[in-house]
């Protein structure tokens, strides 16, 4: 399938993409957290931020920026530490709000939803490993002799985004269903938020120690 567009072993790629999307990460956790705390609207706004951020990174990977980042340690470290700092900021904010017994979002609906989208977008964009991953993964399924490899890259990128959309939609709908139950269980909600905050701190530590 799509062999005429320079895509190799598409079905193998699709299986690999599904497994990759299922691996827990900060983006997935952020979407799930907001679907529980802010409902389906908050969850899908977070997902939109992730989708746009990933699309930008995929385009940059195709444009050759990934090679620049890989061969320029200073640039890689700048993006890496910015991402780690932002993850630490999100985790600390969640933990602080949980300990104080407050909601980590503001009371105003519009600023809250706008902030969710912006945080998800920044979270997605400040991950230098993602852009390097897209190149190393996609290149295995692209025929370098194809006349238009950009089309091949677009097909693979779109497939990954669709798989991600399906999985995140499942998380958002599931999170929305348990929202009412969580809100009636104060202690359970506090424990859940604390674990989410700690996981973000853990993701920050892991990103800060990664090498290009």
Curated annotation (Swiss-Prot):
The chain crosses the membrane at residues 12-32, 49-69, 71-91, 122-142, 153-173, 188-208. One of its GO terms (biological process) is L-leucine transport. It is a multi-pass membrane protein. GO terms for cellular component: plasma membrane. GO terms for molecular function: antiporter activity; L-leucine transmembrane transporter activity. InterPro entries: LeuE-type. Keywords: Amino-acid transport, Antiport, Cell inner membrane, Cell membrane, Membrane, Transmembrane, Transmembrane helix, Transport. It is found in: Cell inner membrane. It comes from the Bacteria. The keyword rRNA-binding does not apply. It catalyses: L-leucine(in) + H(+)(out) = L-leucine(out) + H(+)(in). NCBIfam families: PRK10958.1. Belongs to the Rht family. Exporter of leucine. This is Leucine efflux protein.
